[in-house]
Structures are given as C-alpha cells and as structure tokens.
C-alpha cells in the first residue's frame, strides 16, 4: 500500500509564513469604487450631478484606468460649459492634459448624436407649429460654432421641413450671402418657403445693419419667385433674435 505523501507544513519551510505576513497588499487606486458610486448617483438622480461629474461619466468609456475627474474639470476650465466642451474643435480638446485624440473623438461623437437628435424633432414636421423645437435645434447646431454659418431651412407648401443646409461658412464676424444662390437652391428643392438662420460667435444675437440689409435683399429676391421668407433667426450662445419678431421683415 502506497504511503500518502505528507503536505509540507510551516515547520518544513522556516520563515515562509512570516514572509507571507510581511508581504504588503497591493492598494487599489484612489478612484476605485468611485466610478460605481458615480454611476449609481446618476441612476438615482441625474439632475443632481454637477457638470464636471457628467463629463466624468462620459469619459469612463474613453479612459478605462485613470481618474477622469481632473480631465473633466480641465475641459470645463478651458472651454466654459458642457455645450462649449462638446462644440470645441477636436484638436483643442486633444491638447488638454490626459485627454488626447480618444477623448476628443468620444466628445465629438456625443455632439454629433445630440445634433442629430435635435434635428430629428423638426424634420418632416410643420415647422411653424414646432417653433420652439426649431430654435432648440438651431441652437444645438450653431450656438457654439467659432465661425459664422449661414443656414437655410427649406419648407414645402405645408411648411414641413424638406431640407436643412449650411450654405456658407465665414469668419468670426462675417458670412458672405448671395441671394441669387439662395433662391436658386430653393427652386431646385421645390421649396415654397424658407427660414434663414445664422449664428453670431460673439454670443450676442442682436442683428447688425448688414444682417438687416441682406435680409431685405433676400426677401425681395424670393418674393419675385413666389418664395416666402418666414423669418431670419440669429443664434447667440444664450439666446436668439427673430427679425420678424423685431418687425425687421
């Protein structure tokens, strides 16, 4: 009968147990557990989270094993608000310490989804009856652009949005607009009405003299071909101006 092999005991390896006891335990990084707690706080009360905490959560996907709080705060310090962080140029986001191209891409993806979501609320709908949604969409799309954009919303005879196009992109304070090209594009799309929209990167939506004069030229050019200009809306960072509401059309 084979003799059972004895299992070595502590006495056979002097000092072995002492070595185990002296081996320091690996400490978890200080942010371990913080991610789970922050996720749970979001589930319980998303509106209670600070802006930097929402950005932290967003960065979890792009940054797997690091504390995202300093990066989130640095982004807000650099650009101002969540909306301005998302609208910031990709190369400037990547310059933030700890961010890099992966974080920049993640944020631009979220911005694109937000714009697409806002746009879906106005496409193929009666625009004049959904004016707040139109303004919300234009604000999401243009308010934090660093250069002026001239956008046209083309409508059919039922005032449903059939196309939304950026016709021109200019400088920080000027966008060239050509009434003939605007009217030509409306005819190509069989649009019977249009809404003009452009942004002021300065943040102040007050129409300039040039804005007013250009609008009048466009109204006259469109009227000659039975195309109605419903409004010209100027988008700022914290508000908008309607030339029709101001009785400038």
Curated annotation (Swiss-Prot):
Disordered: annotated segments: 1-34
GO molecular function, one term: metal ion binding
Location of the motif JAMM motif: 198-211
Bias kind Basic and acidic residues: ranges: 24-34
Presence of keyword NAD: no
Classification via CDD domains: MPN_DUF2466
Disulphide connectivity of cysteines: none
One of the GO BP terms on file: proteolysis
UniProt-listed InterPro entries: MPN, RadC_JAB, RuvA_2-like, UPF0758, UPF0758_CS
Residues the record lists as binding Zn(2+): 198, 200, 211
All copies of domain MPN, residue ranges: 127-249
Family membership noted in the UniProt record: Belongs to the UPF0758 family.
NCBIfam families assigned: PRK00024.1 (NF000642), radc (TIGR00608)
Protein name from the UniProt record: UPF0758 protein BCAN_A1306
Organism: Brucella canis (strain ATCC 23365 / NCTC 10854 / RM-666)
